[in-house]
Amino acid sequence: MSKLQILEFPDPRLRTVAKPVQTFDAALGQLIDDMFETMYEAPGIGLAATQVDVHKRIVVIDVSEDKSEPMVFINPDIEVLDGDPEEMQEGCLSVPGFYESVTRIPHVKIRAQDRNGESYEMEARGLLAVCLQHEVDHLNGKLYVDYLSNVKRTRIRKKLEKQHKMRA
């Protein structure tokens, strides 16, 4: 396994809409394993392939405290079920060091495929529902900062650009 480089906002590659996965092979399995390693080391609870400059519809998530519930969602499709939108603090491995309130639906159904191409569906609530929506947004070229005001988004972008220049 190997750790992958995570793209950071405002990198334009984060705006690429991911394409469906067609081939379920050993290379896909290796990518998924590398994504989990990258997510756990970051540390984070979710990672979309777009964030590591692979523009395929793949998401890995583990919202457990002890990294014991790794979940893979390939070609995910989310359906909003019910509940009033709720505000929750979100962070993102592609927007390091920033946490902002975002409004999301707390109960969703997701249809996806596993690493072998088998289709499945499940319902998700709370943190898992929020994480799924956040990661699927990445696959569609959208970031959580897009839900913020222009003022907040610009402030975050400028701070991250300054950090990038200092590292270069």
From Swiss-Prot:
The active site is at E135. The keyword Ubl conjugation does not apply. Its cofactor is Fe(2+). It is an enzyme of class 3 (hydrolase). HAMAP family: Pep_deformylase. Removes the formyl group from the N-terminal Met of newly synthesized proteins. Requires at least a dipeptide for an efficient rate of reaction. N-terminal L-methionine is a prerequisite for activity but the enzyme has broad specificity at other positions. PANTHER family: PEPTIDE DEFORMYLASE. This is Peptide deformylase.
